[in-house]
């Protein structure tokens, strides 16, 4: 699962019964589907990204994690949870400077979404 459409509505996050890897991307300045604040500009409430990641890594019983910060050409924090059930992984990618912007092939960093699932 690659979640780039935004956060889930508050209380509506779901985790599949069968183990599957998940990558979630959020942009810190996104007010349409905010990854940290639960209240969006239009009044909808969204689940914080950290809650979704916590629920997935708990359900998949992930035992190890790593965290990396990228500062050039963009400021991004990647948290990767592994040693999970059936070798599945959970990866959180937080862009510290972007807003509500659909990833495009010509933008730097699109590979970050796929690397955790392909490697």
Predicted regions span which residues?
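Substrate-access "cap/lid" subdomains that shape
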Residues: 4-12, 80
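Short, solvent-exposed loop/turn and secondary-structure capping segments
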Residues: 12-17, 34-38, 104-107
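C-terminal catalytic histidine-bearing segment of alpha/beta-hydrolase fold enzymes
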Residues: 22-25, 47, 57-119
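Alpha-helical scaffold elements adjacent to nucleotide-binding pockets in ATP/GTP-utilizing enzyme cores
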Residues: 52-55
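Acidic beta-to-alpha connecting loop that harbors the catalytic carboxylate
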Residues: 28-31, 35-38, 97-99
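Short N-terminal signal/transit or membrane-insertion segments
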Residues: 13-31
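A conserved short beta-strand
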Residues: 1-7, 20-23
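Short, flexible/disordered intra-domain loops and linkers
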Residues: 35-47
């Amino acid at each position: 699962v690659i979640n780039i459409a935004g956060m889930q509505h508050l209380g509506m996050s779901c985790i599949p019964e069968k183990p599957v890897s998940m990558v979630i991307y959020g942009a810190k300045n996104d007010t349409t589907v905010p990854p940290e604040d639960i209240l969006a500009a239009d009044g909808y409430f969204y689940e914080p990204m950290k809650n979704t990641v916590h629920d997935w890594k708990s359900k998949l019983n992930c035992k190890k994690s790593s965290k990396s910060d990228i500062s050039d050409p963009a400021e991004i924090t990647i948290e990767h949870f592994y040693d999970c059930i059936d070798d599945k992984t959970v990866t959180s990618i937080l862009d510290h400077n972007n807003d509500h912007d659909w990833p495009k092939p010509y933008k730097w960093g699109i590979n970050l979404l796929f690397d955790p699932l392909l490697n």
